[in-house]
């Protein structure tokens, strides 16, 4: 496997791969390098017919805080072409993980905001620590969760989507489980034990049958197509170019409240 700088891949003797986000000092927030490395890693993993499953994990206190601050600043000042290029890279990364032929199991601790929820939405099974917290906070910045939207909406359904997309409020692991974002909530200190239980089930299933079952499920449940993703990219670019985004992002970096907050 290729050695990366922002992520790490390990494979155990049972051919279970671990894909680990490795920017703990930045709460594993996305920048363009991490997005590109995750896309490349997904291609490598997809091409290995010996793998039985992939565990998506993260170093440090947080699973993924969403967009990296410097990356977000660059988006705010980029032209429309640049904004769309970055959004398209993020969408293609999520699609590559979503389409992995083997099961993708997310091990989630700490916070998962914005794009971190996108990673959860493209996973087949999500196991979260009871203390984990989740939010789509984009509207607080004057933005919308457009690029991750096609994947998250399919996971949450209409009611969950409307609530989480509009308000940006923080939800507990139990609430995320009720909405279908999380499959299992592990008791404090028991996250790895819960993951082990799930991996035991993976080891008991026929590898080829699991791949066929996943492919069949994806084909029947309806996945984002190219037009849907392209629409999301344009909507995000529109959002980035709006006055609210300019004010919200400026307030965020100035550590002040945006003009609409009360």
What would you call each of these model-derived segments?
Residues 19, 56, 68, 119-121, ...:
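Hydrophobic/aromatic residues within transmembrane alpha-helices
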Residues 95-208, 247:
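Crotonase-fold acyl-CoA enzyme core
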């Amino acid at each position: 496997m290729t050695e990366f700088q922002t992520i790490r891949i390990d494979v155990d003797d049972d051919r279970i791969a671990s894909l680990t986000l490795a920017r703990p000092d930045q709460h594993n927030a996305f920048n363009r390098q991490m997005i590109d490395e995750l896309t490349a890693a997904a291609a490598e993993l997809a091409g290995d017919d010996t793998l039985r499953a992939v565990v998506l994990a993260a170093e440090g206190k947080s699973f993924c805080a969403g967009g990296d601050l410097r990356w977000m600043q660059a988006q705010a000042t980029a032209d429309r072409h640049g904004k769309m290029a970055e959004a398209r890279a993020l969408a293609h990364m999520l699609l590559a993980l979503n389409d992995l032929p083997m099961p993708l199991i997310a091990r989630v601790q700490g916070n998962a905001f914005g794009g971190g929820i996108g990673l959860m939405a493209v996973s087949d099974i999500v196991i979260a620590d009871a203390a984990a917290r989740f939010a789509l906070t984009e509207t607080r910045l004057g933005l919308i969760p457009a690029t991750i939207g096609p994947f998250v909406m399919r996971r949450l359904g209409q009611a969950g989507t409307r609530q989480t997309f509009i308000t940006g409020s923080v939800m507990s692991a139990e609430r995320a489980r009720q909405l279908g974002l999380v499959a299992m909530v592990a008791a404090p200190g028991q996250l790895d034990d819960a993951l082990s239980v799930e991996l035991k089930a993976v080891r008991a299933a026929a590898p080829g049958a699991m791949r066929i079952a996943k492919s069949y499920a994806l084909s029947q449940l309806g996945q984002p197509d190219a037009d849907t993703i392209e629409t999301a990219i344009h909507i995000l670019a529109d959002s980035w170019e709006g006055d609210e985004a300019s004010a919200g992002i400026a307030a965020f970096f100035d550590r002040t409240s945006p003009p609409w907050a009360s």
